[in-house]
């Protein structure tokens, strides 16, 4: 409702490549349909033999197409970022992505016994970063009845950390924040967000740009939706 998506669409040009990440599928359609001069595609699980949206997205990027997808696929693109496939893209994220969220909780005994001592997982002592061993990757189908496939998937994207030896936390990967020619996060209010605190913790340089005209327009629209009325029972008692 603030007009930032419309402003973004109006500023696309055919000289640059874009990967746009939006919160909802309806907004994916909006970017594809609204960008008349610059053609965008969206991932489709029926596009490839593999039959996943990730494979479709990876194929579009490999071919240098402008792509729009949801936040759901964002963290899955770590392998592409590390391989340098995003280096020619301007990455635009509509709304602040999740910086950290709980993935799973297990007892220290379970983690030590089934994951670490058996050689399926390595945990960095300083950062808590969780990495699967090649053994887990190779044997994942054989051990999926005991070891969490969800934990494996997150660990393979370098975004999983172990907190207090029991809580698995999914953290926004630094490699995605450093990928591409630029990374832009569009949000109504950046200050006070967890993302800024995270960027400062990582030591990454960033710049905050404000669109005063757009913000004032949003304030006026919001004010027009608010009606203030007296409650007679309260007013009469004052």
Question: Model segments located where?
Answer:
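Short, charged/polar "capping" segments at the starts of alpha-helices
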Residues: 27-31, 50, 192-194
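Short His-Asn-centered micro-motif
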Residues: 21-24, 68-71, 93-95, 185-188, ...
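Conserved helicase/translocase motor-coupling segment
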Residues: 181-183, 188-238
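Inter-Walker segment of RecA-like/P-loop motor cores
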Residues: 37-76
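Conserved Walker A/P-loop ATP-binding site and its immediately adjacent core
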Residues: 7-45, 72-73
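Signature of the SF2 helicase/ATPase Hel1-core->accessory helical subdomain module
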Residues: 73-206
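Active-site regions of enzymes building and remodeling cell-envelope glycoconjugates
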Residues: 17-19, 34-45, 65-66, 81-83, ...
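Conserved glycine(s) of the Walker
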Residues: 3-4
